[in-house]
From Swiss-Prot:
HAMAP family, per database record: Ribosomal_uL11 (MF_00736)
Role summary: Forms part of the ribosomal stalk which helps the ribosome interact with GTP-bound translation factors.
NCBIfam families, sorted: L11_bact (TIGR01632)
Gene giving rise to this polypeptide: rplK
Transmembrane segments: none
Keyword rRNA-binding set for record: yes
Cross-referenced PROSITE patterns: RIBOSOMAL_L11
Keyword Cytoplasm (UniProt): no
Recorded family membership: Belongs to the universal ribosomal protein uL11 family.
Name of the protein in its database record: Large ribosomal subunit protein uL11
Entry PTM: One or more lysine residues are methylated.
Amino acid sequence: MAKKVTGVVKLQLPAGKATPAPPVGPALGGYGINIMAFVKEYNEKTASQAGSIIPVEVTIYSDRSFTITLKTPPAADLLRKAAGIEKGSGTPNRKIAGTITAKQLRQVAEQKMSDLNAQSIEAAEKIIAGTARSMGIKIVE
């Protein structure tokens, strides 16, 4: 018989640097799982992606066991790295925070494709372009 799911928790944590301190401890503590076991497993799985923020989905079962599903970094994080900027524009349509090329946009879209609700790479590019626009990042040819 399959294990009964008691909860699903979504977190965005720095790769390889998760600690039992907030936000991890309070989010998972209520389900009674071993927080140190989660932190150790997450850090092992994400050690190669240091410097990125990696979203994780923790499925918690009734026997207090859990499974970890890693996602791709947020589109905004990937776009900031591609544009080489610290943060997006406070006024996106007025002030340009940075620029990326169409090739860089395609690379970000390909990386995010598995997490996006898009059927083709062109549709994924449009989604990522919208995120870039709302951050004040201009796309140049």
